[in-house]
Amino acid sequence: MPSFDVVSELDKHEVTNAVENAVKELDRRYDLKGKGSFEFKDKELTVNLTAEAEFQLEAMIEILKLALVKRKIDVQCLEVKDAYASGKVMKQEAVLKEGIDKELAKKIVAHIKDAKLKVQAAIQGEQVRVTGKKRDDLQEAIAALRAKEFGMPLQFNNFRD
C-alpha cells in the first residue's frame, strides 16, 4: 500500500549557517556593532541573544529571522522566550522547535479524517504515517495538509508506492 510520512525536521547545518550569517550581519550593523552577541547551542537547538537594551534584542531577533528565511528555514519553528535582565545586559532565548508533538499529531490526524479522504493516518512517535490504496488519494492528503496552517512547518517524506 502506498504511504508517506508527515514530519517536522530542521537541517542543523542550515541553522548553523543562518546563525553565522546573523552574527556577520550583527557585526556589519553600525547601530549594533559590539553591543550584542548570538550564542548557538547545537544540541538543544537554542540561540541565546545578549544585548545592552531590549530594543537591540528585538533588532537581533529580526536579523536572526531574516537569516533563517534566507537559508529557507521556516520561522514558524522559532519560539522566542521573554527577555530578562542579567546585570547590565539583557538576555533572551530563541528555541528552534523540531518534531511533531502529540497534540499537533492529533490535529493532523483529525484534519485528514475531516477531509473525508480514503486514507488512514497513524501517529508514530514524532511523525504521522499516512497510508492509502491509491497514490492520488495520498496526493490529495498532502494538498489538504499544505492548505491548512498548523503553526509548524511540515515536510512530507518517505513517499512509497
Curated annotation (Swiss-Prot):
Q: Which GO terms describe its molecular function?
A: nucleotide binding
Q: Which GO terms describe its cellular component?
A: cytosol
Residues crossing the lipid bilayer are none
Q: Which Pfam families match?
A: DUF520
List, alphabetically, the SUPFAM superfamilies matched: YajQ-like
- Would the keyword DNA-binding be found if you checked this record's keyword annotation? no
Keywords in alphabetical order, please.
Nucleotide-binding
Q: Which domain of life is it from?
A: Bacteria
Q: Which family does it belong to?
A: Belongs to the YajQ family.
What job does the chain carry out?
A: Nucleotide-binding protein.
Q: What is this protein called?
A: Nucleotide-binding protein PFL_4775
The lineage, from the top, is: Bacteria, Pseudomonadati, Pseudomonadota, Gammaproteobacteria, Pseudomonadales
